[in-house]
From Swiss-Prot:
Involved in the de novo purine biosynthesis. Catalyzes the transfer of formate to 5-phospho-ribosyl-glycinamide (GAR), producing 5-phospho-ribosyl-N-formylglycinamide (FGAR). Formate is provided by PurU via hydrolysis of 10-formyl-tetrahydrofolate. The gene is purT. The lineage of its organism: Bacteria, Bacillati, Actinomycetota, Actinomycetes, Mycobacteriales. Pathway: Purine metabolism; IMP biosynthesis via de novo pathway; N(2)-formyl-N(1)-(5-phospho-D-ribosyl)glycinamide from N(1)-(5-phospho-D-ribosyl)glycinamide (formate route): step 1/1. N(1)-(5-phospho-beta-D-ribosyl)glycinamide binds at residues 27-28, 87, 297, 366, 373-374. This is Formate-dependent phosphoribosylglycinamide formyltransferase. Residues 125-319 form the ATP-grasp domain.
């Protein structure tokens, strides 16, 4: 189907404005908002708590329970955006389907894609059972007894995760039967919404894992095409990213296979926008892990490595504009954690951190800090990935959160 950008972009805060509503306004949403505003778009930021990072820069901000379909539909009807862009998982996806059916707004990428990716069950069944993509062995369970049985069939080590969570919350690796009950309880506590259901995954003995940022955007022929960023390598701790770098060195065969997998799953989801496709790589073999239909946390590195960051690419794809995935320099990112449980924290050492060559910081402005909450990121470039990684780690270590 041939698609096109809006014929005319309006002026924010006027009757002719082009309006985008973001559902979820954390640090990734904040960067998307800034990218949209640079294109003259009026942005409405929505989150579950006041003064979220995106709230602080949007034209208007709302605090609602986005898992409440009536509240979400009321807000969409009130604001009448042209585009509704989910940025988190915990959203009433039935309400998004209603928005699409009524023609109230365009849902990015689609209501169906949001529904399928909001929990690990929907996307895993699509990838493995419908598309036939290689994945780790897996089972779903909704009681401790079912989890125990699943681990016996899959074997140890294995990974137990909530069917819906973000940033690694509720995820743990289990190495023997003694850890199963603790992992089950941790998964129930860590889900965005407690469905009482988990996925038990076999452990993939991978060489490394990547995020293949994949953009579905309108090409020169007026058709939606698929565009790839260079692969992003990353390290995780308890399922939460702590470092990322771009490009990740890969064999030609592994890179081609990664893009084949990414194109298949994103085409099946449809719509426009950027997708973060997480993959395990073992030699030339590639295994699908997860996909997010939005900018990916590991993609924060693109703030300095690409001509257009993942956030700018998402903004352009949303609006039907051309995209450019050119890599301009090797780079890396390293997470700055809160370190303390407190509200309204400060940061010491910022000048020292920014004295590291070719380094920038993003402090997200989250109103509440936790010891393991991501409160900022250091992003560095260099002549090669290893230099950039060393610089990013050093810069992040110089920032000290203080209550």
């Amino acid at each position: 189907m041939r698609e096109q950008a809006p014929v005319r972009f309006g002026t924010p805060l006027t009757a002719g404005a082009t309006r985008v509503m973001l559902l979820g306004s954390g640090e990734l949403g904040k960067e998307v908002i800034i990218a949209l505003q640079r294109l003259g778009v009026e942005v409405i930021a929505v989150d579950r708590y006041d003064n979220a990072p995106g709230h602080q820069v949007a034209h208007r901000a709302h605090t609602i329970d986005m898992s409440d379909p009536e509240a979400l539909l009321r807000l969409v009807e009130e604001e009448r955006p042209h585009f509704v862009v989910p940025e988190i998982e915990a959203i009433a996806t039935d309400a998004l389907a209603t928005v699409e059916e009524r023609g109230t707004a365009v849902v990015i990428p689609t209501a169906r894609a949001t529904q399928l990716t909001m929990n690990r069950e929907g996307i895993r069944r699509l990838a493995a059972e419908e598309l036939g993509l290689p994945t780790s062995p897996y089972e779903f369970a909704e009681s401790l007894e079912e989890v125990r049985a699943a681990t016996e069939r899959i074997g140890f080590p294995c990974v137990i995760k909530p069917v819906m969570s973000s940033s690694g919350k509720g995820q743990s690796t289990v190495r023997d039967t003694g850890g199963v009950e603790t992992a089950w309880e941790y998964a129930l506590a860590g889900g965005r919404i407690n469905y009482g259901r988990v996925i038990v995954e076999g452990f993939v003995d991978f060489d490394y894992e990547i995020t293949q940022l994949t953009v579905r955007a309108i090409g020169a022929d007026g058709e939606v095409g698929t565009f790839f960023c260079e692969p992003i390598g990353h390290l995780q701790d308890s399922g939460d990213y702590v470092e990322s770098w771009q490009p990740q060195p890969m064999s030609d065969a592994a890179l081609a296979r990664s893009r084949e997998v990414a194109e298949k799953v994103t085409a099946a989801l449809g719509g426009r926008g950027i997708f973060g496709v997480e993959l395990f790589v073992k030699g030339d073999d590639v295994y699908f892990s997860e996909v997010s239909p939005r900018p990916h946390d590991t993609g924060l590195v693109t703030l300095r490595t690409q001509r257009l960051s993942e956030f700018e690419l998402h903004a352009r794809a949303i609006l039907g504009l051309p995209v450019d995935t050119t890599l301009t320099t090797p780079g890396a990112s390293a997470v700055i954690y809160g370190g303390v449980d407190a509200t309204g924290i400060g940061f010491d050492g910022v000048a020292d951190a920014m004295a590291v060559p070719e380094t920038d910081l993003r402090l997200f402005g989250k109103p509440e800090s936790f010891v393991r909450r991501r409160m900022g990121v250091a992003v560095s470039t260099g002549p090669d990935v290893e230099t950039a990684r060393s610089r990013a780690r050093e810069a992040a270590s110089r920032v000290e959160p203080v209550a």
